[in-house]
UniProtKB/Swiss-Prot annotation:
Protein name as it appears in the record: CDP-diacylglycerol pyrophosphatase
A single BP term in Gene Ontology: CDP-diacylglycerol catabolic process
Annotated Gene Ontology cellular component terms: plasma membrane
Membrane topology: Single-pass membrane protein
Annotated localization: Cell inner membrane
Species classification: Bacteria, Pseudomonadati, Pseudomonadota, Gammaproteobacteria, Enterobacterales
GO molecular function: CDP-diacylglycerol diphosphatase activity
Keywords: Cell inner membrane, Cell membrane, Hydrolase, Lipid biosynthesis, Lipid metabolism, Membrane, Phospholipid biosynthesis, Phospholipid metabolism, Transmembrane, Transmembrane helix
Class of this enzyme: hydrolase
Organism per entry: Yersinia pestis
């Protein structure tokens, strides 16, 4: 058998092994992709409706359409989750006129962090994040409410004077990934809201919302900064905007107890 044939067989075998390994990883990672929805639909909502007790959630607001759940990862991380099935950022429901403003609701829910911490937390130390369709493990929309990474806060502060009320690339990106940023006011956070600002103002975003991760943090001025990154096979970026967060909350003066 010629060396070229052996080499081709070797490459083919290697390719098959890579595909099988990728499939196994995908299966293990996403086999429990409905875990959050099961907690909300089978525990939090029933307990709230029958016993007026949101457990294991911290809050269930059925009229407003959301629940807040303490995440197991990190002492202060919470998740805001819709009380109706919504897969994620790619869902067209988020861009309808009647959709709740989940980002605004998540920002209001940040008080759970301070309550758990036992002291006020500066808004500039807090961040919200939703991962792209390719950078998440759950198929129920959830917004991470957690601390901002110290190095991210420092990097953003270096450019704070340049942030405008329109999308612009962030020079140098963050954590090795490309990001676009937009300054938004408190009014814009409420209306039209982050999902609409991304879909309506970022060229081409409305047709491929699932490829975007989206995050928000407060600026010292009282405005907010919206950050978006886009999944890319070329740069191996899954657009997990959660990467901007630090669930151990090193940014706080005193580290919280798990």
């Amino acid at each position: 058998m010629s060396r070229s044939i052996k080499w081709r067989r070797y490459l083919l075998t290697l390719l098959i092994l890579i595909i099988l390994a990728a499939g196994l990883i995908y299966k293990l990672r996403f086999s429990n992709a409905d875990a959050l929805w099961k907690i909300i639909s089978q525990q939090c909502i029933p307990h709230m409706t029958t016993e007026d007790d949101p457990r294991p959630c911290a809050e269930v607001n059925i009229p407003a359409g959301f629940a807040v759940l303490k995440d197991r990862n990190g002492p202060l991380q919470y998740l805001l989750i819709p009380t109706v099935p919504i897969s994620g950022i790619e869902s067209p429901q988020l861009l309808t006129a009647t959709s709740p403003n989940y980002f605004a609701d998540a920002w209001q829910a940040r008080y759970f962090m301070a309550e758990k911490y036992g002291a006020p937390i500066d808004d500039t130390d807090i961040s919200l994040a939703i991962n792209s369709q390719y950078g998440r493990t759950q198929d129920q929309l959830h917004i991470h409410i957690s601390c901002l990474k110290p190095q991210v806060k420092t990097a953003l502060a270096a450019h704070s004077a340049d942030f405008q009320q329109q999308w612009q690339p962030l020079p140098g990106g963050l954590l090795g990934h490309d990001y676009w940023v937009r300054r938004i006011t408190a009014t814009e956070l409420q209306q039209p809201g982050p999902f609409h600002l991304l879909a309506d103002e970022m060229p081409g975003a409305k047709e491929q919302m699932g490829r975007y991760g989206l995050a928000i943090t407060a600026l010292p001025s009282g405005d907010f900064l919206l950050l978006a990154n886009k999944a890319s096979l070329i740069t191996q970026d899954r657009a997990s905007a959660e990467e901007l967060q630090d669930h151990t909350c090193q940014v706080l003066p005193h580290l919280p107890v798990q």
